[in-house]
Amino acid sequence: MATTEWTTQKPGGSTQQPGGQEPLASEDYVVKTMPPILGTVDMTATYVLVILFITNVPTAVPGGAATFTYWILGAITFFIPCVIATAQLGSMFPHEGSLYNWTHKAFGGYWSFFAAFVAWFPSVLLIISTGDLLVGFFQGLNSNWLVEPWQQGIVVIAVSILSGLVAIQRFRMVQNMVNLAAGFMLLGILLLGLAGIVWLVTGHPSATSFSHLSDWTINFDPKTGNLGLFGVIGLAYLGTEIPLRMGGEIVGRQVITRHLLWGTLIVLIGYLMSTFSVLVVQGQNADYTLFSVVNTVDMALGKIVGSIVVISLMSF
């Protein structure tokens, strides 16, 4: 992997970017004022939380066995190329801001601002949607909970306030919370994957057919086709560059490639394993709600383990 910086030395010791651009102030300021505390585990945990959204699984399973085809096709055509590009750019320019910094070097200030804004803005909306997901969990536990819109609104507001309070804590404390949340989420996904295996081992039939080639193929029919799943899969794989927005705070350049390698493997295995269990236990007609993954565990491993999965996913 190349690690050469695209800068030239000017008289007096300052550096200059190709085309006469001066380096961004953040390239020097961040490394001088913020401690390099992010290691491979920290960056991998952030990477996994950003990309491995278990909510994408119930949305993808209507494709049946073809969902695996789309997961693999999306990984080959989009996800892995993004990972390779992120590793290359991150190694060449290991600076704070990632996408903004890289776009600034290639296209200048206008387009770097545009790229950074459209990458940042969905994060604001994501805080709201996370509160809505929490509401979905509570309603899955008891259909009589949070039935009124104002009750749901209070939960969303509470999650937003809690997010703000967490954001003003010491960075190391926040990162430890991120690592813990990633661990809980992986525990939930591991139990979900185990549910599919136990379901088959205990003699239950698979709710989805995997035995015919037609089950795995892409269907282009406008009315009954599954081509739209490719968009769902592409959305699920977004975000490879997000952890490197903190690129000026990593302990060394080896963290860049290591967290991308391990994080990518965890994401791929997590999505495939979760999809397998939902398809085997509930089939492609599983409902589109997040709680369908919990129902999968309830059916195969019992309510107690299902409750553990609920707590694990709610921590995310």
Task: Tell me the role of every PLM-derived stretch.
Residues T67, W71-I72, L180-F184, P243-L279:
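Junctions where cytoplasmic loops transition into the N-terminal start of transmembrane alpha-helices
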Residues N101-W102, G108, G140-W145, L261-F316:
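TM-loop-TM module centered on a large, flexible mid-protein loop between adjacent transmembrane helices
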Residues P58-A60, Q88, Y100, H104-K105, ...:
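Helix-loop junctions at the membrane interface of multi-pass solute transporters
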Residues F138, Q151-T208, L260-L265:
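Membrane-interface loop-to-helix entry segments
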Residues M1-L73, F79-T86, S211-T217, E249:
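Membrane-interface "cap" regions at the ends of multi-pass membrane proteins
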Residues F78-C82, L192, I266-S274:
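Alpha-helical transmembrane segments of multipass membrane proteins
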Residues P35-Y47, T69, G108-F121, V155-V156, ...:
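Select transmembrane alpha-helical segments in multipass membrane proteins
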Residues V61-G63, I80-S160, G164-L165, S307-S315:
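Hydrophobic transmembrane alpha-helices that form the core helical bundles
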